[in-house]
Amino acid sequence: MTNRISRLKTALFANTREISLERALLYTASHRQTEGEPVILRRAKATAYILEHVEISIRDEELIAGNRTVKPRAGIMSPEMDPYWLLKELDQFPTRPQDRFAISEEDKRIYREELFPYWEKRSMKDFINGQMTDEVKAATNTQIFSINQTDKGQGHIIIDYPRLLNHGLGELVAQMQQHCQQQPENHFYQAALLLLEASQKHILRYAELAETMAANCTDAQRREELLTIAEISRHNAQHKPQTFWQACQLFWYMNIILQYESNASSLSLGRFDQYMLPFYQTSLTQGEDAAFLKELLESLWVKCNDIVLLRSTSSARYFAGFPTGYTALLGGLTENGRSAVNVLSFLCLDAYQSVQLPQPNLGVRTNALIDTPFLMKTAETIRFGTGIPQIFNDEVVVPAFLNRGVSLEDARDYSVVGCVELSIPGRTYGLHDIAMFNLLKVMEICLHENEGNAALTYEGLLEQIRAKISHYITLMVEGSNICDIGHRDWAPVPLLSSFISDCLEKGRDITDGGARYNFSGVQGIGIANLSDSLHALKGMVFEQQRLSFDELLSVLKANFATPEGEKVRARLINRFEKYGNDIDEVDNISAELLRHYCKEVEKYQNPRGGYFTPGSYTVSAHVPLGSVVGATPDGRFAGEQLADGGLSPMLGQDAQGPTAVLKSVSKLDNTLLSNGTLLNVKFTPATLEGEAGLRKLADFLRAFTQLKLQHIQFNVVNADTLREAQQRPQDYAGLVVRVAGYSAFFVELSKEIQDDIIRRTAHQL
């Protein structure tokens, strides 16, 4: 890491995070002037107004220009989506347990007196709440499932970066002008053209700013850098980039502009090493210094950490630690099935090793063709302990997409959005992460409904659980589709849509079915606890008959809080096998019930003509979802978290080592889980020391690939280090750990999430 990158990294975290009202005020000012116009045009005009008037800055020593807010890591509001939680939490932002922000008293006044009164009863949240049935609301209130993205932009998408970089804005504007001429009444084309032209003007604002700063700069080197930024910006406003610097700059400008359009999570980066490779090679051919090109890439990696999301307190529990979702996958396959690893794949990991920040959320695609040098570079990066990169298995993901009707060429081009959500770059609107389904809560409901049922059998209970899962899935689908329609009718994204195939051909926004592939991704959570509970219940009640069903239910209701309850809990934990230890009897329960969940989910269609697709990952939702479930037959206390990750074993229950964990997960139908899965594994640092440690990890990754799991990620850290960080956070400000599908600064997490990470089993190889 160069001195410049070190200083940029330090400066990014030097000040307290604040809330900025600027976007909200500009958006509202435009909206007041466009009453009665079509929603998509109002949205486009509001975004264009922001791009014209928002304050811009180029910070000291930056090589890549473009900041969403003048102050680093500021949160921005979207009252047009949901003004109510913002009003409720204005006074809590600086002191809440998770994701704190400072906000001035004047900004609180402006929000209460100007912004909220305008957006009350005008927001997307009003529409969604008005459409939700009482039954759906009751299920979400008890957290049987959650409906996400009701208060913010949807995001969770990868635009067609090759289209942006290989054509340039000037050519794209000309193409959109032709569409407008051919279909002058099409509001989508009008909105997209308006925003493409506004993007050009916004980039030119940076050119002018850089020139002004250069004119007043006394440092010769910095003046030259500013003039180069100005030159690159003027070029990018009209022409396609030629060099790596130009390509990185246009790439980042568009990221910032799309943030203004929707203020959404997970506008992800796709296959960065593939589409950026020609520009990197051109710069090398032109004689650019390889060390400087690496510094450019490190600059871009630092910039990815400038964007944080302002979430509600509730949402921050589900998505703790600012998971922005700047996710990129490296390596993988070409469209003809050959290895896609290239020199930039290695450089992306090298640059990450230098900066070691939570973003970008890098991943590596592994397959039977992956070569040893790249696998060792991957293992080396994992050993740094930040949880990056995560690993995805082409041997599972490509067939998963083929089963969903994706072409072979497109399936081989897959990438990931957000945490682990599988997507086809530039061709998919997957509505990933639209809902989370609490499988353990469903079991709890079934247990209590059977109190006093002397005729209950284990098979009968299983059938009731399946039926109840099916019933609540119908309600989850209903709520998800209402949210889907809400985004269509209230929050179209015409600029983003102009970079998604087949929106231009159809003349429709992604929210209106314009994309080639249309999915709705929903997550089943708690499968490890569910299978552990049913296996123990079957043994204790129906096979060994040590307790009647009602007696066990009474112990659970009391939360094991009696001497007899403590003995029962000890037996439930210690005498019955647990998922994650390669025990067929319990693993098969997981496989059967998760398959049932998946097959039920995939029956349903969304308003865009696509289908629901199942996944299993938690982000940090295993903590709040566990808080609403009482004590369970796996020995879990009432309110205790669920198993982390999605497919991970329950904390402390994976006693047979990491290979046994892999074998348990391999018994699940990983191919069915086409919205993504998540497996957390924690290693002690000592087990990965030296060349031998790296080779053991590389061998473990090959075993993961051969066993056909879909995903795995790692924490490499001692629990003692994490406990010290809890006690002395000021000494561990830079400590990055893996949460679930993303990494975060440990000291920025709430204590409940910190404790969860500490308690995860630390394995040795």
Curated annotation (Swiss-Prot):
Keywords: Lyase, Organic radical
Domain Glycine radical: 645-765
Top-rank taxon: Bacteria
PROSITE patterns noted in UniProt: GLY_RADICAL_1, GLY_RADICAL_2, PFL
CDD domains per the UniProt record, alphabetical: PFL2_DhaB_BssA (cd01677)
Pfam family, one: PFL-like
Its EC number(s): 4.2.1.-
GO CC terms, sorted: cytosol
GO molecular function, one term: lyase activity
Protein name: Probable dehydratase PflD
Lineage, highest ranks first: Bacteria, Pseudomonadati, Pseudomonadota, Gammaproteobacteria, Enterobacterales
